Regions:
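Hydrophobic membrane-insertion alpha-helices, especially the h-region
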Residues: 21-33
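Blade/loop signatures of beta-propeller domains
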Residues: 46-49, 58-95
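Extracytoplasmic beta-rich repeat domains
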Residues: 97-111, 135-153, 160-163, 176-193, ...
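Short loop/turn segments that connect beta-strands within beta-propeller blades
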Residues: 129-133, 170-173, 210-214, 250-254, ...
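Short loop/turn segments immediately following beta-strands, especially the blade-tip
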Residues: 420-430
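Ser/Thr/Gly/Pro-rich low-complexity, disordered linker/stalk segments of secreted
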Residues: 436-511
Length: 511
């Protein structure tokens, strides 16, 4: 220190000014570097965090080829894996019917006992016949909605943004059984089990309501607005908040079991969790507004890995374990890509350009992952193993598809479309413009004849079966299309709910 003072005293005033400026610049660089390290750490990889192949994502019994299943809640199962393991549902498809509405359907329907139930953005509840698309009943029960209902024993349980409420509605005819005013708006798709309805709200509360009358069993205040729907595994609810924390809450009594410090144990900075988490393999997976997807230990909250994309990740993560691909998580990003990442290590397996920004959930049905682009207004399907595009349909914005293991139901901007798998044999069909993996009606008879000939062992001479790879087939963008995401800051829809701003950025998600 004395030597430094001696040097300082020997300097001229001009030299002192220069030295002070250099020292200040160095100090700013060091502080900024330290801040960036805390605020924007590099991707984390912790191989010591527990991982189990015995927990979730494909461990439910695979449906028999001719058996339908019920998709009773957003995300399919209690862990919100967004994965239905069925061998039947794969392109090519034929269109069965299309129902066209007027308002945005931001969150996908649920499918129960031959009926589809959903709520549009204007709070209109709709029940459709799953075999025909015919409207069974339609009622406006709110003025603003952005969530899916949940079904349990003949009743639909739901929330709304305006008014701030929870509802129980009879599935048969839409009769309201009870209404519960909430302390703040909610777009948290409910989870119903053990006689309770679990939801979050913008006051930062996670609530358990009695399904018989809507009375509050418990409420727990978290670190910020809770917009995602909670996921469940082994007696615990998992949900992120707008304070940038992932939370584990005991379902029985609302006790907070663990809460990450901002973006994970030992990580500084903060981003918003809009993404509804998926719980599988002993881990919790969720996307964040800091452009990353995180994997946490479900028992302790310890961070296992983080994976950076080029823009916001509002997209809900799908977790699947299928033959040939192994445990993998799939998600979209505002950077216009869909990603497949090793569920254990966080290493990228593939990425594919989606042709637009993805805000809604990635959803896996069979061996295809589906995503919708709100800036491209389309729905795509990618092969789980390779990321190759096998399906395209020129409609879609947020929640892409659900299925009853016999039919695929696609959510367009304001429509619902039913697709049935079709055996084309060796017939090479031509798709309509903007589509891939969909056999046009005029060619379906030839396709069926080719399939019968194949079954009898007769060659058709039409060459190998096409998946719609002809003129007019939508081949999609090149792999790794990382065009500007530019989603802008947080969502907003006038004075209603927060959404990404207009001008190609679209509305705020689903998760």
């Amino acid at each position: 220190m004395n030597r430094i003072l001696t040097i300082w005293r020997g300097m001229t005033n001009g030299e002192r000014v220069v030295a002070a400026a250099v020292a200040l610049a160095l100090a700013i660089t060091v502080v900024a570097g330290a801040y960036a390290l805390l605020k924007r750490p590099g991707d984390v990889s912790n191989p010591d965090v527990a991982f189990s192949l015995e927990e979730g994502a494909g461990k439910e019994r695979r449906p028999k080829p001719r058996k339908t299943v019920n998709w009773t809640r957003f995300g399919y199962d209690l862990g919100r894996s967004k994965f239905l393991d069925t061998p039947r549902i794969r392109p090519p498809f034929r269109k069965l019917w299309k129902w066209q509405g007027e308002e945005l359907i931001e969150f996908p329907p649920i499918v129960v006992d031959g009926r589809l139930y959903f709520i549009d953005n204007d709070g209109v509840y709709v029940a459709l016949d799953a075999s025909s698309g015919k409207v069974l009943w339609r009622k406006r029960l709110a003025s603003l909605n952005a969530s899916s209902p949940a079904y349990f024993k003949g009743v639909l349980y739901s929330v709304s943004l305006a008014p701030a409420q929870a509802l129980a509605v009879r599935a048969r005819d839409g009769k309201v059984l009870w209404r519960k005013p909430l302390a703040a708006r909610s777009e948290s798709s409910p989870l119903v089990l053990s006689g309770r309805m679990y939801i979050g709200n913008e006051a930062g509360q996670l609530l358990a309501l009695d399904i018989d009358d809507g009375s509050t069993a418990w409420e727990t205040t978290l670190g910020g607005s809770v917009k995602a729907g909670p996921a469940f595994a082994d007696g615990t609810l998992y949900v992120g908040d707008y304070g940038g924390r992932m939370n584990a809450v005991r379902a029985r009594d609302g006790k907070l079991l663990w809460q990450t410090s901002d973006l994970g144990t030992g990580i500084g900075g903060s981003g918003r969790f809009y993404s509804t988490p998926a719980v599988a393999f002993g881990r919790v997976y969720a996307g964040n507004a800091d452009n990353r997807v995180y994997s946490f230990d479900a028992e302790t909250g310890e961070i296992a890995w983080s994976f950076s994309t080029g823009d916001y990740v509002y997209s809900g993560v799908a977790a699947a374990d299928t033959r040939g691909t192994g445990p993998t998580v799939y998600f979209g990003s505002h950077d216009r890509n869909v990603y497949a990442v090793d569920a254990k290590t966080g290493e990228e397996k593939w990425s594919e350009g989606a042709g637009g920004q993805v805000s809604g959930p990635a959803t896996v049905v069979g061996d295809v992952v589906y995503a919708s682009t709100f800036s491209g207004n389309a729905t795509i399907g990618l092969d789980l193993g390779s990321g190759r595009r096998v399906f395209s349909y020129d409609d879609g914005e947020y929640g892409p598809v659900v299925s009853d293991a016999q039919v695929l139901y696609l959510t367009g901007g304001a429509s619902v479309v039913a697709f049935e798998p079709i055996d084309v044999g060796s017939f090479r069909y031509e798709t309509n413009k903007g589509q891939k993996g969909i056999v046009p009606p005029a060619q379906q008879r030839k396709a069926k004849r080719a399939a019968r000939e194949r079954a009898r062992g007769v060659g058709s001479g039409d060459g190998p079966a096409g998946a719609g790879g002809s003129a007019g087939a939508a081949g999609g963008g090149p792999q790794g299309d990382r065009g500007g995401g530019g989603a802008g800051p947080e969502p907003g829809k006038g004075g209603a709910r927060e959404r990404p701003p207009p001008g190609g950025q679209g509305r705020e998600p689903e998760r």
